[in-house]
């Protein structure tokens, strides 16, 4: 298996999500993490970083969009680092979050348990419950720039 090349474009299908909400594609046996990707999408992916056991990439063109892709309603989505699932329909967001827990229990915990379906919010908007406060080397504290 040849290593993937930084800057080169490969065609792949997104087959799942990482624990951080990145799409996961497999190209010639290599795992590629792709932000703003949706499970089931067939896309051209440019390799942006080659690491020891995986690669990072970005979508160049979507050949077959997922029916679970939606246009984010937030103008900062994809730039501020706070809404990893904003481009997903709410049912797909819940499936992705359920998969995250299932993967942690099975692959990391070694447990043979089945995670129940997530009971979603009645109103899937305006329920943000996470905030990141990065601390700089100089001691400054603040939000990521959008």
What are these regions (language model features)?
Residues 1-146:
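Non-catalytic accessory regions of SAM-dependent methyltransferases
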């Amino acid at each position: 298996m040849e290593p993937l090349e930084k800057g080169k474009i490969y065609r792949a299908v997104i087959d799942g999500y990482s624990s951080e909400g990145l799409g996961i594609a497999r190209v010639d046996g290599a795992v590629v993490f792709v932000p703003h990707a949706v499970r089931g999408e067939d896309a051209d992916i440019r390799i942006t970083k080659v690491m020891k056991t995986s690669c990072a990439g970005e979508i160049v063109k979507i050949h077959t969009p997922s029916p679970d892709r939606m246009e984010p309603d937030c103008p900062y989505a994809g730039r501020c680092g706070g809404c990893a699932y904003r481009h997903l329909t709410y049912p797909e967001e819940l499936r992705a979050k359920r998969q995250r827990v299932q993967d942690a229990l099975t692959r990391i915990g070694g447990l043979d348990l089945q995670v129940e379906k997530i009971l979603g919010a009645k109103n899937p908007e305006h329920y943000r419950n996470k905030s990141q406060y990065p601390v700089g080397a100089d001691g400054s504290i603040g939000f990521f720039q959008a």
